[in-house]
């Protein structure tokens, strides 16, 4: 069985509190890992972006402090600020998880993106598949 490189996306709306950020980031990541049958050893990296109104805790720190169901010390985490877009959704954390997955034929299997807690509005075309 071949390993192919792919990515899966996620987003979650949060309140600007450490508790909300930790709880929601861990929940989103658990769902990404579970729905896509991802193991820590197959993850290349996990990148987050946050809107500029999230100021109390970055999602990588939240994930390290919380419980996402995998050992998150096994792969790099990275955070950056989302571009500020007029009229854009507020209090959003977005994720891009790059990972290897098993593929019998070398094709990339369907990925299950995760949009939670109001972030479904960002990509209704992807959220509907879940």
Q: What is each PLM-predicted segment?
A:
Residues 1-130:
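Terminal domain-initiation and capping elements
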């Amino acid at each position: 069985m071949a390993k192919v490189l792919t990515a899966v996306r996620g987003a979650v709306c949060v309140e600007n509190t450490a508790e909300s950020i930790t709880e929601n980031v861990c929940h989103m990541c658990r769902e990404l890992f579970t729905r896509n049958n991802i193991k820590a050893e197959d993850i290349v990296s996990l990148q987050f972006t946050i809107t500029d109104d999230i100021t109390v805790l970055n999602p990588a720190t939240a994930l390290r402090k919380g419980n996402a169901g995998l050992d998150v010390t096994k792969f790099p985490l990275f955070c950056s600020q989302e571009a500020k877009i007029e009229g854009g959704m507020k209090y959003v954390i977005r994720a891009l998880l790059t990972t290897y997955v098993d593929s019998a034929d070398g094709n990339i299997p369907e990925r299950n993106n995760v949009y939670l807690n109001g972030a479904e509005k960002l990509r209704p075309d992807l959220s509907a598949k879940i």
